From Swiss-Prot:
Pfam families: dCMP_cyt_deam_1. It catalyses: dCMP + H2O + H(+) = dUMP + NH4(+); 5-hydroxymethyl-dCMP + H2O + H(+) = 5-hydroxymethyl-dUMP + NH4(+). This is Deoxycytidylate deaminase. InterPro entries: APOBEC/CMP_deaminase_Zn-bd, CMP_dCMP_dom, Cytidine_deaminase-like, dCMP_deaminase, dCMP_deaminase-rel, Deoxycytidylate_deaminase_dom. The active site is at 86 (proton donor). Zn(2+) binds at residues 84, 110, 113. Its EC number is 3.5.4.12. Belongs to the cytidine and deoxycytidylate deaminase family. Residues 14-146 form the CMP/dCMP-type deaminase domain. The gene is DCTD. It comes from the Eukaryota. The keyword Phosphoprotein applies. Catalyzes the deamination of dCMP to dUMP, providing the nucleoside monophosphate substrate for the thymidylate synthase/TYMS. Also, part of a nucleotide salvage pathway that eliminates epigenetically modified 5-hydroxymethyl-dCMP (hmdCMP) in a two-step process entailing deamination to cytotoxic 5-hydroxymethyl-dUMP (hmdUMP), followed by its hydrolysis into 5-hydroxymethyluracil (hmU) and 2-deoxy-D-ribose 5-phosphate (deoxyribosephosphate). Catalyzes the first step in that pathway, the deamination of 5-hydroxymethyl-dCMP (hmdCMP). The lineage of its organism: Eukaryota, Metazoa, Chordata, Craniata, Vertebrata. Its cofactor is Zn(2+).
Length: 178
């Protein structure tokens, strides 16, 4: 009888990497040509309770609304129309509420999303990028989070890439239970 390894593999994804990867994978659904942002809401039991990405509102054609960042008229840009990933994750929640949950998000939230996060009862925001740190919107978001007691921190990944290889399921040798 051959001996099957009893030791677990040590290269598995830990929870934080898994949740941030889900946020990044969700971002791939965004049709925005400039910014693809995803968000993943997790409860205290490490269960995903909401996922979202930036996109146009339900029922509004993303072929008819603008995706540009700049124009003479603000109505000809995406900004008055697009729903941010944080909003969509909260609206897509699969539980009665998200009070006390954590949100993993690719980009530090703007002030409008900060208000939604606070009102939803989310207590922690883990973000990957803070590239708009000095903007008024990010400054206001930090102030609101501090006042409401929402903690926020930059995500420090243990690896720089997570590869999804659909062919890998067929390349691993199968093990038969004996």
């Amino acid at each position: 009888m051959s001996e099957v390894s009893c030791k677990k593999r040590d290269d598995y994804l830990e929870w934080p990497e898994y949740f941030m990867a889900v946020a990044f994978l969700s971002a791939q659904r965004s049709k925005d040509p400039n910014s693809q942002v995803g968000a993943c809401i997790v409860n205290s039991e490490n269960k995903i309770v909401g996922i979202g990405y930036n996109g146009m509102p339900n029922g509004c054609s993303d072929d008819q609304l603008p995706w540009r960042r700049t124009a003479k008229n603000k109505l000809d840009t995406k900004y008055p129309y697009v729903c941010h990933a944080e909003l969509n994750a909260i609206m897509n929640k699969n539980s009665t509420d998200v009070k006390g949950c954590s949100m993993y998000v690719a980009l530090f939230p703007c002030n409008e999303c900060a208000k939604l996060i606070i009102q939803a009862g989310i207590k922690e925001v883990i973000f990957m990028s803070d590239k708009y740190h000095d903007s008024d919107e990010a400054t206001a978001a930090r102030l609101l989070f501090d006042m409401a007691g929402v903690t926020f921190r930059k995500f420090i990944p243990k690896c720089s890439k997570i590869v999804i290889d659909f062919d890998s399921i067929n390349s691993r040798p199968s093990q038969k239970l004996q």
